[in-house]
Amino acid sequence: MGSPEDAGKAPAYRVDHLLSAVESELQAGSEKGDPTERELRVALEDGELWLRFKELTNEMIVTKNGRRMFPVLKVSVSGLDPNAMYSFLLDFVAADGHRWKYVNGEWVPGGKPEPQAPSCVYIHPDSPNFGAHWMKAPVSFSKVKLTNKLNGGGQIMLNSLHKYEPRIHIVRVGGPQRMITSHSFPETQFTAVTAYQNEEITALKIKYNPFAKAFLDAKERNDHKDMMEEAGDNQQSGYSQLGSWLIPGAGALCPPANPHSQFGAPLSLSPAHSCERYSPLRNHRSAPYPNPYTHRNNSPTAYTDNSSACLPMLQSHDNWSSLGVPTHTTMLPMSHSTGTATSSSQYPNLWSVSNSTITPAPQSSGMSNGLSSQFLRGSPVHYTALPHPVTATTSTSPLYDGGAPADLPDSQYDASAHTRLASMWTPITPPSM
């Protein structure tokens, strides 16, 4: 326990380290000082970069909300009184008496200038401050914004397509205010624009401005997106016609793992097409029709023969193993002319169908030899020849009349049902060549 006398004493705080920090701050830059201000000098930072822009006629963007400058205007100062207070100001003056326009890759005079905007002065946010503060590091005007609207807020209003030159003013404060000096640098002249006109200026801005990297990345992303969209346009994403059925494009030939039960098995492809779960001809199952029955078109629509773009993924029939196809009276071979088999086009002939009767024929080579047969309904649709063998399944869709369930053996097929449908079928006669 301390004595009551000790309790009444205020605790002793050491402030020497605080005073030392303040003294160090005041001394920083003092070595460049001159209390007489006779040796005051202001030098432009990044002079070489400014010269590169000036050679191409520098441009600065002006917007409604204001845009910062690049290159950033920075100056090094020496010769101030370290203990005096100064404010740094920035304004812009017209560099000439012209309005400019960009024609055929160069700036040319484009008429009389517009009336000068009200004088706008930007005060550096560190103002006022000691001379030592201004001399210890370059003074940067990185926060100044250029606008083409008179909206205040410390922004500088400039007229678009006019040439300007920045000026830096140093004013001594804390006593009788007097102008110390004004400095301008011809290499900092620029033309105010709402969008860059010279592509070389744009390239320099992107190259040297660290904040323009986001603009560059966005441009690269857009270019990559355009390339991907262009590549996608070259691939047929719709449905190409094989005979009377619509086969989906390359992106749709891999159906979901559990297709609808009323549809037949999907068209099998080789493992090279990344459809591993649908190995070709697994268990000798026949692959009858492509999955999307809903795309069957019964209207007399003419389809363009674009086999090279739509069917690059289908293997030639030479690489297909023979399929064991059950023989039913519902599968009818369809003969075609010799010109169809030897023609260079995959869909050379159109056969018209009308209601009549047909005579079933045994299925011996219609599916495994040359071109395969098709199932033609009694509809006034024009069908084209199928270029490659496509097999049929024993399961039928409810879309077909008199279809038998998929799980019934061959012996349970009702032949009378097909006889009753005889009037729905038509004989097929290829047109004369």
UniProtKB/Swiss-Prot annotation:
A single BP term in Gene Ontology: cell fate specification
GO molecular function, one term: protein-folding chaperone binding
Cellular component aspect of the GO annotation: chromatin; nucleus
InterPro entries: p53-like_TF_DNA-bd_sf, T-box_DNA-bd, T-box_sf, TF_Brachyury, TF_T-box, TF_T-box_CS
UniProt KW Transcription keyword: yes
Main localization (coarse): nucleus
SMART domains xref list: TBOX
DNA-binding region(s) in UniProt: 49-217
Subunit structure: Monomer. Binds DNA as a monomer.
Function summary: Involved in the transcriptional regulation of genes required for mesoderm formation and differentiation. Binds to a palindromic site (called T site) and activates gene transcription when bound to such a site.
Listed name of the protein: T-box transcription factor T
Source organism per UniProt: Gallus gallus
